[in-house]
Regions:
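Bacterial Sec-dependent signal peptides at the C-terminal "C-region" and cleavage site
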Residues: 14-20
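Bacterial N-terminal signal peptides
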Residues: 4-13
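Structured loops at beta-to-helix junctions and adjacent beta-edge loops in soluble globular domains
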Residues: 179, 211, 257, 281, ...
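Recognizes the extracellular SEMA beta-propeller fold with strongest preference
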Residues: 334-363, 382-403, 408-416, 420, ...
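Short helix/loop capping segments that flank catalytic or ligand/cofactor-binding pockets
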Residues: 184, 209, 216-218, 223, ...
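Structural signature for solvent-exposed beta-strand/loop edge elements and short helix-capping sites
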Residues: 20-384, 484-488, 516, 705, ...
Length: 795
């Protein structure tokens, strides 16, 4: 079995060097000195009985307890250029540029046009702090020499042999030679980031050359180059831990910006737009995995586009299962390549055109489960799409294709598909509103390869005449067709007294051609009519006030509503191979045809919905706040398209958010009749009773659903702050139906003053076998990107 431990130890070299930083400078005197009552030195020099006719430059003032004149003035030489003036005790130097300096002694030399400050020197300007034993102020340039000073600005402090300030693209940049950087603001810091040269971009990043991480008197990590941003997406990240199927592991990520041009003086990439995150992960049970993620930072992050992710691992044990499901024929060569991008290529005053890509190539069906379980839980079968899109204020048009790059899960293809949606808008300058949806495409759906192979093997083993053979044949039949679908709807909002009435009428057609399998081509015509009626009542409650519960007067709003929806269409035969079809859910279906995405499952329906919304609104933060909302409704089926019901459940959707430390969400549905209906309760509550304790509890009950499994699940999360240093977090998930504690997770947090650390441990019961994991978190408080993250939930 291959064990690439050598690569691991080459990455993290531990050095035993005892080279200490220079002895820390003595703490400066308090920075709260008040301006003394004495006259500034310029007033003294204007006194003709004691000084020549010279003055400090305009905008410079020096104060001190004692003034002494030295140099040629005391020898009878009245040359102003030889004058030396000493200030002793509680020195304060001010300039009109905002610079302030404090020291024990100031020596002004008019010959050299300098002021020598010494003894507990502190310089302040633009939020920056310099500290040291001496510094020289130039009277002509009104600037200080910062050699052998310590520089401090949030969140770092810098000690260096020399520091110089330059301006790059309008920003102040500091270049320090033989530098030591820390965020631990004490006389004897617990750690230093050392380098031969450090370039500091305040509020952005630090670039190190010949970097050492030093804790105490030990060099812990050396790198020839490190660009360490204050942004958590960049810089170095390390995550050690362990998990049953992965073994012990250390995940390493290093993020840097690419693109742009390098500045020769600062080493910064100007105009860099491509964020790259490089991964090198070592697993004792899997081997070495390496990859890179690229993010286009020019795109809006909210769009969810703009990255390329590549990862590969030569798996030492690819058939080790995680959830107790046997694996066979899984090759060691495991990888993932994901490209998600939107490339705008044309923009007009009314429209924007772009090329969109969303592609994911996986080596096998278990890759996401092993190496990206957080994505696996929400999207275990990623789509693959390429297309051109046109967006305008009133419409969305797309010509694209859905590909089948991964044959190990069931998916459909669209080669190609054209869609055009008109949003609801006025029709020809009339009160009528119009909306429509049109799509045309060639569609196919295929089973996963392992499913086809399994069914084919089962069919080959059957005896002649076995009824199971026909069932398998139907499952193995190719499913596909060419489909044209269009639907158009008009609506007319009407105000009738106290009532809001919105009638809607729509019609459409769906045509299937080139149908694969036993079915013939077919056309379907859809006719739909709807009417929505609602009204509102409200009552002002000015005396309903409570500081404890966040109420400053209230208004109670009641909104009764009803909706009648009718659809008539040609039904498809039950054997027809539907592609855009319904999936099981416990929530009510969408009953507006234009928003009904399961086009192939459109069926006749007649449904009346009756409901009432209640809102209790109060004043908060110069605005209005929904203190309590409740929506209660049910459906009466004149014709039920799915389950032949007379009535749906009675639904209640409740949200209560009275104060920031309390939130309650509750969704319930109970049978109105006793015929084939189910019960569901889904609730969650977050409560922070005091500053040191917070918990969140959720409960879900599902019973007698026709498709979904019964469930009684409790989820509990807590965080307790024991004191200024210790905190404990927990997460438990319990399934009461089979009395299974599905997840136990425990996190311990400790504040090390300059560092923060956490350790987490979890046990997951997969019913067939247990899974264990552990991870650690260690980071510098003020530099979140230089840390070890804890991501128990993602594992």
């Amino acid at each position: 079995m291959r064990r690439p431990f050598a690569l691991f130890f080459l990455t993290f070299l531990l050095a035993a060097s005892q080279d200490d930083l220079p002895t820390p400078l003595p703490s400066p005197t308090p920075d709260t000195l008040t301006e003394p009552d004495g006259d500034p030195i310029s007033d003294l020099l204007k006194n003709s009985s004691q000084a020549p006719s010279t003055e400090l430059p305009s905008g410079v003032e020096i104060y001190g307890k004692t003034i002494r004149l030295d140099g040629s003035l005391n020898q009878g030489n009245q040359k102003a250029s030889d004058t030396i003036v000493r200030y002793i005790g509680d020195i304060q130097l001010n300039t009109d540029t905002g610079l302030k300096a404090y020291a024990d002694l100031a020596v002004t030399n008019f010959s050299k046009k300098t002021v020598q400050l010494s003894g507990n020197v502190s310089l302040y300007q633009d939020g920056l702090v310099y500290r040291g034993e001496s510094s020289v102020f130039n009277l002509e340039t009104k600037s200080f020499e910062t050699k052998d000073l310590r520089l401090g600005f949030s969140p770092i402090m810098l000690k260096a042999k020399s520091i110089r300030q330059i301006t790059s693209d309008g920003r102040k940049v500091f270049i320090a030679e033989d530098a030591g950087i820390t965020t631990h603001d004490t006389e004897d810091p617990a750690f230093w980031l050392q380098s031969k040269r450090a370039t500091i971009f305040p509020d952005d990043k630090i670039i190190f050359k010949d970097f050492n991480l030093r804790i105490g008197n030990r060099n812990l990590l050396w790198l020839p180059y490190l660009a360490q941003p204050f942004d958590a997406n960049r810089g170095y990240l390390i995550a050690p831990g362990g998990q049953t199927n992965l073994g012990a592991f250390v995940k390493n990520r290093y993020g840097i910006m690419l693109g742009g041009e390098s500045d020769l003086e600062t080493g910064e990439k100007k105009g860099a737009w491509l964020l790259s995150q490089w991964h090198a992960d070592l697993y004792s049970n899997k081997g070495l995995g390496m990859g890179v993620d690229f993010f286009d930072t020019r795109l809006e992050s909210k769009d969810g586009y703009g990255w390329l992710k590549i990862y590969h691992i030569d798996d030492l044990n690819p058939e080790d299962e995680r959830a107790g499901v046997d694996r066979t024929n899984i090759k060691p060569n495991r990888f993932r390549a994901e490209f998600v991008h939107r490339i705008p290529f044309l923009e007009t005053p009314d429209s924007r055109y772009s090329f969109d890509a969303n592609l994911t190539l996986l080596s096998d069906q278990y890759y996401l489960e092993d190496f990206d379980p957080s994505l696996f839980r929400i999207n275990r079968a990623p789509d693959n799409f390429l297309g051109f899109t046109k967006r305008s204020p009133n419409s969305l048009t797309q010509l694209g294709t859905r590909l089948r790059l991964n044959d190990f899960y069931q998916s459909d293809t669209r080669l190609p598909e054209f869609t055009h949606d008109w949003i609801r808008q006025p029709f020809l300058d009339t009160p009528l509103l119009y909306e429509s949806q049109t799509l045309l495409g060639i569609y196919q759906e295929r089973l996963a390869k392992f499913q086809r192979d399994s069914l084919q093997s089962e069919a080959d083993a059957l005896l002649a005449g076995d009824p199971r053979f026909d069932q398998i044949s139907r499952l193995l039949d190719d499913r596909g067709f060419t489909r044209f679908h269009t639907y158009h709807e008009f609506s007319l909002p009407i105000k009738a007294g106290h009532f809001n009435v919105v009638p809607r009428f729509g019609a459409g057609h769906t045509n299937y051609q080139a149908v694969q399998g036993p079915d013939d081509s077919i056309g379907r015509t859809h006719v739909s009519a709807n009417i929505d009626v609602s009204t509102k009542f409200n009552k002002l409650l000015p005396n309903f006030k409570s500081d404890k519960w966040g109420i400053d007067g209230a208004r109670h709003i009641i909104e009764p509503y009803s909706s009648l929806s009718w659809l008539s269409t040609n039904d498809l035969d039950s054997s027809f191979g539907r592609i855009d079809r319904l999936t099981p859910t416990s929530r009510p279906r969408q009953r507006q045809v234009g928003r009904f995405t399961a086009v192939d499952d459109l069926q006749d329906w007649s449904i009346l919905r009756l409901g009432m919304r209640n809102r209790l609104v109060t004043r908060r933060d110069s605005g209005m706040h929904d203190w309590l909302t409740m929506d209660t409704y049910f459906d009466a089926f004149i014709e039920d398209p799915e389950l032949d019901r007379d009535f749906s459940n009675l639904y209640n959707d409740i949200r209560w958010n009275p104060v920031p430390w309390l939130e309650l969400d509750l969704e319930t549905q109970f049978p109105v009749s006793t015929t084939d209906n189910f019960t569901e309760i889904a609730s969650s509550m977050r409560l922070m009773p005091d500053d040191d304790f917070e918990f969140k509890v959720g409960y879900r009950h599902l019973n007698n659903h026709p498709v979904l499994r019964d469930s009684d699940r409790i989820v509990l999360e807590t965080f307790t702050r024991l004191n200024d240093y210790w905190g404990i977090g927990t997460h438990h998930r319990l399934e009461l139906v089979d009395s299974t504690l599905e997840l136990q997770q425990y996190n311990i947090h400790y504040d090390f003053d300059s560092f923060v650390g956490s350790a987490g441990f979890f046990i997951r019961n997969n019913r067939s076998q247990d899974e264990h994991g552990i991870m650690f978190n260690f980071g510098i408080k003020e530099i979140p990107s230089l840390s070890l993250p804890i991501k128990i939930g993602a594992q």
